[in-house]
Amino acid sequence: MQTPPGKTLVVGASYVALECAGFLTALGFDTTVMVRSILLRGFDQDMARAIGNYMTTTGTTFIHDATPQRLERQEDGKVLVTYLEAGEEKTCVYDTVLFAIGRYAVTQGLNLANAGVEAESNGKFRVNEQEQTNVPNIYAVGDVLYGRMELTPVAIRAG
């Protein structure tokens, strides 16, 4: 990055989104997190609220029940963000917008159906405790697992 990010909007409420927002705030940048529904989906919500409260006390701003609708680059290079917050249209200008809205499994091109591997509609696989798919000699680990936490340490430990 050749220039500092300045006033930043982080769209998303995953651990990656909050980690990015946290370090940007710690570096002194005005940082806002746009949350569609809840922080840290899939995690303990008491802990998620505690993390959100802590981040608020350290300077991160949160916009809850919000979704971006339109982004427009202004002549000065800043980004005008139009969003809905609790159904009401609002706007704000940011220097940088970071989308951290999740991942999806890109498994369709692997032709695994020919091997008999069954995938969910989102491309992810159900596995047993040993990370075996429905085909005993075919395994899956990491972010392609259906219903599992998408955490790097979990994937590393598995395989």
Model-inferred region functions:
Residues 1-5, 91-158:
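FAD-site-proximal beta/loop scaffold in flavoenzymes
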Residues 11, 18, 41-42, 58, ...:
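Thr-Gly-centered strand-to-loop micro-motif
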Residues 5-9, 15-88, 149-156:
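Rossmann-like dinucleotide-binding cores of NAD(P)H-dependent redox enzymes
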